Amino acid sequence: MMALSLEYQKYLIEKMRIYALFGGGISMENAKNRPPFRYDIVGSFLRPEALKEKRETFAAGKIAAEELKEAEDAAIRDLVAKEKEVGLKAVTDGEFRRRYWHLDFLAALEGIEEVGAEKWSVAFKGAQPKATTVKIVDKADFGDHPFIEHFRYLQSLAGDTLAKMTIPSPSMLHLICCVRATDYAPIKRYEDEARLYENIALAYQKAVRAFYEAGCRYLQLDDTSWGEFCDPEKRKAYEARGFDLDKIECAYVTMINRVLEAKPADMTITMHICRGNFRSTWFSSGGYEPVAEILFGGCHVDGFFLEYDSDRAGGFEPLKHIKDQRVVLGLVTSKTADLENKDDIKKRIEEAAKFVPLDQLCLTPQCGFSSTEEGNILTEDDQWKKLRLIREIAEEVWQ
């Protein structure tokens, strides 16, 4: 039998201590002040026009990187102040330094390269993002990654408020490079796909430790793979290409759980499941039934941020597979300016509570307001109205 490292032995001892104290659940009194919170956010915010202009001039080669960074720093400083003002218990940097919610992080991993593309890797139901993608060119690893410094700056602004960091789920690297890409051919190192899954998991374990050492205690994995696997049409298309989606789903859950082995006891890691969010449009539709048992029943994240702002997400019945995690209901859309009716949202929370105890439920926008630098079709004022509404509802439901 393989001997466990001293570091892993210490981790197991601490894990057992926490379970002895709290029974492994989230409903204990000591866990109530931990994220995700009763009213929370997914992560991205609309970029100010001044920042958009700076990014355009930088892309055109008219200003230096330092000038762009100064503009980003100022915009993030203003954003964090507004997040605190609206009463958020966890703040993000709005993803203001990114072009895309996922590709900037993935392309900065070792062994991963951003490349041009004829079209986006999945088709939206309307406007399409600027075409680019990533590919695996060498061993996937986490090295000197710029997102650690991004987090440190956010942490310096957060003060007594919790700083939340969002990154793409490890599933996204495999999905984009190996599933969506019709011309994928593994490099020699990864002809055995199990080795690829393991390397991605190990890279993300390093990421978890690096963020933790930088002070991060609230990390979110953003993931559109599950949204795609909920879509009947996409399932048929992938299966027609020879993919066994049940096998892939199990591999993804196993990989994510492997990543979570590196999570210290006082760190929260959640997952946001998305069906696409670009210029107020989407690319997937379908309830959670096809993935619920594998994902909700097997993935060990601390909470799930789930889209539920339209009938494209189906009903709440699949939530019966949830264990003791928190479920953050995305009942308020981030795609349009229309302000939801407070009573309607409360009724939907009551419906969800038939399948998950109310004490495990929270409320959030269905997605970020700007998953790419272009942003959804609403105003900054609209996004703050949405967050104030969410806080009001949460305070009335969970008094």
Where are these regions (language model features)?
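Domain-level signal for soluble alpha/beta catalytic cores
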Residues: G24-Q399
